[in-house]
């Protein structure tokens, strides 16, 4: 079976986006562990960039994935907008849309859209270390806007379905 690195975005002193006491680093860790558990139960070899509240730079995470010779890299994040409750939905970022990573991202987005999230699409970001410096297909998934109440309610109430949707999007692509 393939090796998938599951990256919980941010961590330690890097809270990521925050909203009314909610920290992106906590949401990403909880979701990364849940997604990884589903993948492990499906026979996938999973490597976590973190399993507790520590910080590593995105470049360190990419380097660790490369050293482990992983087959895929999935980074889990929450989005944020300049104004509270301004935007809603999910988005996946890849280095190149016309790639294996783009296919994985489309599958993940489609699954999350089926749970009621607005699908903001798959977009290219060539400046992100976890997408640029990894030697394997890499996807950064933005699971709802942390400063949008509707997305947080969906994130909390459908947490395990979200984890399953992300895992299924990965499994259907590898």
What are these regions (language model features)?
Residues 26-174:
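Active-site-proximal helix/loop segments of hydrolytic enzymes
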Residues 1-19, 74:
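Catalytic-core environment of secreted peptidases
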Residues 16-30:
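Glycine- and acidic-residue-enriched helix-capping/strand-helix junction motifs
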